[in-house]
Amino acid sequence: MYNKRIKRVLPPEEMVTDSKQESGGQKNGDKTGFDATDLKPYLLKDPETMAMNFARALENLGQAASAWLAPRERGEITETAIDPMTDMVKTLSKISEYWISDPRRTFEAQTQLMSSFFGIWMRSMQRMQGTRGMQGEPLPPEPDTRKDKRFSDEDWQKNPFFDFLRQVYFVTSDWVDKLVSETDGLDEHTKHKAGFYVKQITAALSPSNFIATNPQLYRETIASNGENLVRGMKMLAEDIAAGKGELRLRQTDMTKFAVGRDMALTPGKVIAQNDICQIIQYEASTETVLKRPLLICPPWINKFYILDLNPQKSFIKWCVDQGQTVFVISWVNPDGRHAEKDWAAYAREGIDFALETIEKATGEKEVNAVGYCVGGTLLAATLALHAKEKNKRIKTATLFTTQVDFTHAGDLKVFVDEEQLAALEEHMQAAGYLDGSKMSMAFNMLRASELIWPYFVNSYLKGQEPLPFDLLFWNADSTRMAAANHAFYLRNCYLRNALTQNEMILDGKRISLKDVKIPIYNLATREDHIAPAKSVFLGSRFFGGKVEFVVTGSGHIAGVVNPPDKRKYQFWTGGPAKGEYETWLEQASETPGSWWPHWQAWIETHDGRRVAARKPGGDALNAIEEAPGSYVMERT
């Protein structure tokens, strides 16, 4: 019946055009009439097996629902005001109020959308007739549907139904974005939040995320008689159970990697530790080393081994091979015992503790320091504190994708305003920390179309196990945030922008970046969605000394972890960070490949003296355990 109905609506003689019509169509592959034989992969062949598998999939879905509901019934999970859904509803209601409050405004917006829909519908009807309309006129230009990996399957354009859905989706997404941008009377933060939430909704409602509206999913479901859904719903239940009531999105095969076995392999020793960190010294691989040791302060929002994923990608190993004596702070994965550990504690018991350890192990008081992301923000604040205290141990500082000014801090600012922060602080007070899954989801939401929905479709609708990928393993190996530390960071940096306003109080002292006179290598990545290059650029001008501002290709991770042997990307140098970022970048000099050798040369320019290679701990400190240590092994 289904096949006959299709043939009545779309007779083959109307859908298959002759060669003259085809040659008269638009260039660049404008399609001829639709061939009904293309529907064969979409026709159900074994309804009985499909029905049985559908029942099995529903059974697995019920198990997923039970895994989600059970901890809530036991009171182990309570929905709180920090749920993004709560703020999203409040924010988008303001957009809705603006457009509904004026009938003329409402009518104009609806007319624009309906006009776009009508154009798409007319084109779809004409495509049913062939490459030209019923009167022989050329088809109207196809709306801009842009390149999008979600719609790479050829049937998104070849099949009129899916082509129609695709075009409607893009037109509707653009229309909703325009509603936000043209809403008057909203403050900048609220409009930013509204735009962000609209992108989340449109990403979630993409036709690529549903079986009935995704040609590839539909064909695979028909071809396997629904076996993909049985597997997918089983994995969904497993992942909700693994997350103890929250979905732990399956992005990679977590069983294929282990820290210390497959990653974080650079030889070294843990030579000191306290409540919040371990200090690792790596074994030398050269006969001589630079006199000044190198201290790396990584972020605590993720784990340090992003800089030591494997020997081929390891920044740490590369530094060791260049003759650097490398020390790394490995932060604890905090729990309730660390609730009161604030920024001052991380500065004193982290960076200062590491500097004291380095002096004991090497006898050196002068150090080169590197800070990555929030680790760089802490390093910058600690440098300002040291300047206030006349502490001159750190002689140069390198900042990877580090924000010190948060004026242009990007989409993470969506999650920080007084109302949301107060709710978050109340939530953290109960346990003493913020669970790592909350931060992980926030980061994934920044690129939902790349980091959430493709994996949702692949795992739970296609029923495919994800491929092993070391970077995604690291991304999923999230950490908790100590309550006092996280609250200080969000309130003083994202909310108040206190560090560049000379309003930050650290360990009882008001600090200023203008007091930081040492040379700084400030690295931004061009496509960074966490620490935008424009934000890093602006931050460069608040230091009191010379800043070498460098921009590298790619994003927050790939731009930093870019070994020279890969011959990927490029970097730009162009003198002081003055004027506008866009102008600076246009005038900067581009160099192909990795920025690592450029940075190494910068380090040696400031002190290239060498001494005999050192052993971990020297004569003063005994090894506690092998690198990468036990703190990094603690899973959330």
From Swiss-Prot:
Subcellular location, in the record's words?
Cytoplasm
Enzyme category, top tier? transferase
Q: In the UniProt entry, which residues are flagged as the active site?
A: C373
Where is the sequence biased in composition, kind Basic and acidic residues?
A: 143-152
Q: What is its EC number?
A: 2.3.1.-
InterPro entries attached to this UniProt entry: AB_hydrolase_fold, PHA/PHB_synthase, PHA_synth_I, PhaC_N
Q: Which residues form the signal peptide?
A: none
Q: Which reaction does it catalyse?
A: (3R)-3-hydroxybutanoyl-CoA + [(3R)-hydroxybutanoate](n) = [(3R)-hydroxybutanoate](n+1) + CoA
Pfam families, sorted: PhaC_N (PF07167)
* A GO BP entry: poly-hydroxybutyrate biosynthetic process
Sorted alphabetically, the keyword list is: Acyltransferase, Cytoplasm, PHB biosynthesis, Transferase
The record's region (Disordered) falls at 1-38, 129-152
Tell me the GO molecular function terms.
acyltransferase activity
- Output the Gene Ontology cellular-component terms: cytoplasm
Recorded metabolic or biological pathway in which this protein acts: Biopolymer metabolism; poly-(R)-3-hydroxybutanoate biosynthesis
Give the function comment from the record: Polymerizes D(-)-3-hydroxybutyryl-CoA to create PHB which consists of thousands of hydroxybutyrate molecules linked end to end. PHB serves as an intracellular energy reserve material when cells grow under conditions of nutrient limitation.
Name the protein family.
Belongs to the PHA/PHB synthase family. Type I PhaC subfamily.
Name of the protein this chain belongs to: Poly(3-hydroxyalkanoate) polymerase subunit PhaC
